[in-house]
């Protein structure tokens, strides 16, 4: 009687793969739970650990040379992690180990290992900007917005920074050059590339493979330092993850975006690195000043903001020929707030083809109303704008994630009015629409302004969800 090999041979192969991986004969439960992971397990089993150890050592030598650890310690940590499953009997923890080991064996070489080989020549592409000429203008603009009253009784969360940030920054500079199609930067470091006088801390990045990159980096740090590294996901920040050490010290964070979003983000090329176009960053800064917390930051360190603002103003002057003469025309656009329904109506007909923009302060309400409109042409730019946009029957619909400042009862403060205008202009830039005249008027509307006190402000939209995390040491993934 002939036997079907599928009934005997293949299960025996699967059993052998699992047995080799665990270093023991699996229990019946382990076998049935892990058999669908046989392909991943086999990749882990045949993975060349010696080559991997060599890559980690090279990464250590290049980016973490000041960390006091020996080559033998690195090797021991790596081999210990790749044999961890032999001492693990909890099915959930085994699944976590398999998932994280799979990421390492399939992606580490291409993502971080490649940083150890000779880099392409850097294409020097810097332009000399006269930032000094914009410093007084920036100071005048920021001074008129420096209106937050600091509540000394307010307890501020401390942002503890790891001593490894400088090492990770060195790695990130190379990473941004090697992976400039999938990873771009913004914030202080990107402006530092334009103006070396800018101070920066960690490097802010947007990328299309954030989770994989952060897992690989977390393991690199773990293998080099021996520290327990934790990856956290914050529910109210879209597609955001952060790496912290076991003492809750911040190492690096990243926003993940789709490739189609990456393709439309305005960017410029400097020294083999793509940075978010400073025009776009300037609009984001103007938008963020509507957030009361950001105005409090401004009052604490105005010179830090002044250096950034002056750099971006000089960039837009040079790039777009913006003339700062105080001619603001219809900027900021008229904004009327419905505090009960939490919607701001912005009159846009003087600048755009759509006559008005309805800005929702509650994302769920906007989503519901878009469904009622039966419109399927909304644009979601993820964390780039923190909002979707829809134009329907000559009306733009969008969501604004920041607070709205009021200068009097029922009256939108001009800081928030400009923030709302900037939010609309972000859409214009992302969709290759017209924005330069509006940009010129918006920037000129910030000149020669008196300080206007804040009467009150709306609350931010409350985001549902729970914190997620990956704890490498404890073999836990919660998302």
Curated annotation (Swiss-Prot):
<protein>
    <recommendedName>
        <fullName>Poly(A) polymerase catalytic subunit</fullName>
        <ecNumber>2.7.7.19</ecNumber>
    </recommendedName>
</protein>
<keyword id="KW-0244">Early protein</keyword>
<dbReference type="InterPro" id="IPR024397">
    <property type="entry name" value="Poxvirus_polyA_pol_cat_C"/>
</dbReference>
<dbReference type="InterPro" id="IPR024231">
    <property type="entry name" value="PolyA_pol_nucTrfase_Poxvir"/>
</dbReference>
<comment type="similarity">
    <text>Belongs to the poxviridae poly(A) polymerase catalytic subunit family.</text>
</comment>
<keyword id="KW-0106">Calcium</keyword>
<dbReference type="InterPro" id="IPR038419">
    <property type="entry name" value="PolyA_pol_nucTrfase_sf_Poxvir"/>
</dbReference>
<dbReference type="Pfam" id="PF12630">
    <property type="entry name" value="Pox_polyA_pol_N"/>
</dbReference>
<dbReference type="InterPro" id="IPR024398">
    <property type="entry name" value="Poxvirus_polyA_pol_cat_N"/>
</dbReference>
<dbReference type="GO" id="GO:0006397">
    <property type="term" value="P:mRNA processing"/>
</dbReference>
<dbReference type="InterPro" id="IPR004976">
    <property type="entry name" value="PolyA_pol_cat_Poxvir"/>
</dbReference>
<dbReference type="InterPro" id="IPR038337">
    <property type="entry name" value="Poxvirus_polyA_pol_cat_N_sf"/>
</dbReference>
<feature type="active site">
    <location>
        <position position="202"/>
    </location>
</feature>
<dbReference type="Pfam" id="PF03296">
    <property type="entry name" value="Pox_polyA_pol"/>
</dbReference>
<keyword id="KW-0479">Metal-binding</keyword>
<dbReference type="Pfam" id="PF12629">
    <property type="entry name" value="Pox_polyA_pol_C"/>
</dbReference>
<dbReference type="GO" id="GO:0046872">
    <property type="term" value="F:metal ion binding"/>
</dbReference>
<feature type="binding site">
    <location>
        <position position="202"/>
    </location>
    <ligand>
        <name>Ca(2+) 2</name>
    </ligand>
</feature>
<feature type="binding site">
    <location>
        <position position="204"/>
    </location>
    <ligand>
        <name>Ca(2+) 1</name>
    </ligand>
</feature>
<dbReference type="GO" id="GO:1990817">
    <property type="term" value="F:poly(A) RNA polymerase activity"/>
</dbReference>
<feature type="binding site">
    <location>
        <position position="253"/>
    </location>
    <ligand>
        <name>Ca(2+) 2</name>
    </ligand>
</feature>
<comment type="subunit">
    <text>Heterodimer of a large (catalytic) subunit and a small (regulatory) subunit.</text>
</comment>
<keyword id="KW-0507">mRNA processing</keyword>
<keyword id="KW-0808">Transferase</keyword>
<feature type="binding site">
    <location>
        <position position="204"/>
    </location>
    <ligand>
        <name>Ca(2+) 2</name>
    </ligand>
</feature>
<keyword id="KW-0067">ATP-binding</keyword>
<feature type="active site">
    <location>
        <position position="204"/>
    </location>
</feature>
<keyword id="KW-0804">Transcription</keyword>
<keyword id="KW-0547">Nucleotide-binding</keyword>
<feature type="binding site">
    <location>
        <position position="202"/>
    </location>
    <ligand>
        <name>Ca(2+) 1</name>
    </ligand>
</feature>
<dbReference type="GO" id="GO:0005524">
    <property type="term" value="F:ATP binding"/>
</dbReference>
<comment type="function">
    <text>Polymerase that creates the 3'-poly(A) tail of mRNA's.</text>
</comment>
<dbReference type="InterPro" id="IPR037265">
    <property type="entry name" value="PolyA_pol_cat_sf"/>
</dbReference>
């Amino acid at each position: 009687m002939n036997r079907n090999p599928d009934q005997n041979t293949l299960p025996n192969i699967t059993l052998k793969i699992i047995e080799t991986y665990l270093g023991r004969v699996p229990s019946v439960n382990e076998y049935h739970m892990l058999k669908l992971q046989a392909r991943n397990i086999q990749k882990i089993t045949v993975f060349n650990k010696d080559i991997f150890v060599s890559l980690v050592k090279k990464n250590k030598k290049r980016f973490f040379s000041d960390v006091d650890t020996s080559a033998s310690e690195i090797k021991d940590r790596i081999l210990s992690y790749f044999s961890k499953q032999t001492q693990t009997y909890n099915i959930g923890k085994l699944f976590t180990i398999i998932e994280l080991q799979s990421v390492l064996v399939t992606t580490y070489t291409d993502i971080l290992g490649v940083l150890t080989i000779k880099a392409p020549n850097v294409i020097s592409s810097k332009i000399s900007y006269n930032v000094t000429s914009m410093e007084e203008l920036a100071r005048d603009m920021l001074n008129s917005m420096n209106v937050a009253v600091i509540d000394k009784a307010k307890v501020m969360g401390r942002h503890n920074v790891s001593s490894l940030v400088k090492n990770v920054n060195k790695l990130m500079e190379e990473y941004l050059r090697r992976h400039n199609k999938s990873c771009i930067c913004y914030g202080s470091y990107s402006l530092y590339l334009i103006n070396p006088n800018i101070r920066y801390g960690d490097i802010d990045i947007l990328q299309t493979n954030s989770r994989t990159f952060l897992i690989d980096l977390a393991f690199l740090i773990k293998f080099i330092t021996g520290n327990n590294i934790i990856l956290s996901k914050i529910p109210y920040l879209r597609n955001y993850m952060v790496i912290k050490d076991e003492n809750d010290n911040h190492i690096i964070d990243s926003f993940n975006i789709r490739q189609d979003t990456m393709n439309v983000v305005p960017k410029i090329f400097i020294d083999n690195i793509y940075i978010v176009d400073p025009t776009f960053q300037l609009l984001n800064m103007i938008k963020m000043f509507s957030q009361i917390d950001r105005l409090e930051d401004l009052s604490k360190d105005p010179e830090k903001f002044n250096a950034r603002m002056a750099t971006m103003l000089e960039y837009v002057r040079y790039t777009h020929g913006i003339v700062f003469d105080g001619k603001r025309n219809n900027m900021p656009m008229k904004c009327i707030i419905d505090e009960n329904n939490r919607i701001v109506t912005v009159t846009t007909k003087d600048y755009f083809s759509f006559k008005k923009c309805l800005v929702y302060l509650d994302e769920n309400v906007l989503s519901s109303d878009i469904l009622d409109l039966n419109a399927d042409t909304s644009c979601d730019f993820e964390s780039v704008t923190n909002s979707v946009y829809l134009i329907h029957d000559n009306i733009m619909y969008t969501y604004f994630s920041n607070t709205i400042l009021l200068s009097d009862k029922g009256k939108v403060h001009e800081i928030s009015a400009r923030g709302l205008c900037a939010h609309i202009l972000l859409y214009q830039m992302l969709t290759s629409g017209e924005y330069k005249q509006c940009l010129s008027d918006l920037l000129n509307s910030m000149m020669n302004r008196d300080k206007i006190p804040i009467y009150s402000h709306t609350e931010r939209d409350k985001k549902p969800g729970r914190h997620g995390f990956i704890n490498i040491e404890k073999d836990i993934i919660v998302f």
